[in-house]
Regions:
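A general secondary-structure signal for short beta-strands and their flanking turns/coil
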Residues: 3, 57, 71-73
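Enriched for short, Lys/Arg-rich terminal
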Residues: 64-114
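An acidic, glycine-rich, mixed-charge low-complexity segment common to nucleic-acid enzymes
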Residues: 1-5, 53, 114
């Protein structure tokens, strides 16, 4: 049985996050990562519930960097949105520089968990 192609959606504010990334190359990579996640070619790490960020246990984090050298500088937070039976979409929640907890805090706020 073929896997159904997931839709790509985003929460309000995600587009603003993308445009806030420092250059076109980084912006494109953030969007390309979502396409690769949807295709099942890459996968993020599950997030959890933490005192500082709230409950992000239905979300995943994925690190990326167009430079490809050293520690990735950017973080993408996304989640799968289900219907009654299975995931039907990948929902982009937040993206930004990998500094502190900023992206996680933005994600929690957009999900109404802060």
């Amino acid at each position: 049985m073929a896997r159904r192609k997931l839709a790509l959606t985003s929460l309000p504010g995600f587009e603003r996050d993308v445009y806030a990334l420092p250059d076109l190359r980084t912006q494109k990579m953030a969007l390309d990562m979502l396409v690769l996640i949807r295709a099942g070619r890459v996968q993020g790490e599950p997030l959890g519930q933490h005192v500082k960020t709230g409950d992000l246990s239905d979300c995943y984090k994925f690190y990326f960097d167009p430079n490809g050298a050293g520690k990735p500088r950017y973080r993408l937070v996304y989640r799968y949105t289900p219907d009654e039976v299975e995931a039907i979409a990948i929902e982009a929640v937040a993206v930004g520089e990998r500094s502190g907890l900023d992206v996680y805090l933005t994600a929690a706020e957009r999900l109404g968990r802060r």
